Amino acid sequence: MRTLKSLVILLAFGCYVPLVLADDASVIISSPADGAKLGRTAQTKINYEVMPGSKGDHTHLYVDDKEVAVLRQLKGSHTLESLAPGKHEICIKIVSKGHTPIGVQQCIKVSVEDQNDY
C-alpha cells in the first residue's frame, strides 16, 4: 500500500512539474551588454529572446521608461535610432493581449558617449 501511495504522489508531482515549467516567462537581452558604452552616431541593435509564458502575449521595448516599439517575435532584434549622449535604460517587458505588463522584464543600462570621448 505504501508503494502505491508513493507511486501516486510521484505521478501527480510528475504531471504538475511540466505545467509549472510551461508557465515560466523570461526575457533575455543578449546585446548590447549591461553597462555597454556606445558611440553617439551608431544605431543600437537590441538582440533579444522571449518566453512569454501563459500570461504573456508579446513584448514592449522601452528606453528611459518611454515605449519605443512593440515586439511580436519571440526571438529577434530591433534597431534603435541613435541615442543622446548620457546614460540610458533599455527594457523589454512581456505584456498581455491588453498591453498590460505581466511583471516579467529585463533591463540593461548603457552609456552613450560623444565621438570626441573616444
Give the ranges of each region predicted by the language model.
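Short beta-strand segments within Ig-like beta-sandwich modules, predominantly Fibronectin type-III
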Residues: 67-74
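Short acidic/polar inter-strand loop motif in beta-rich domains
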Residues: 69, 95-103
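Short coil/turn motif common to extracellular beta-sandwich-like domains
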Residues: 38-47
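Short, flexible loop/turn segments at beta-strand junctions in immunoglobulin-like
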Residues: 80-85
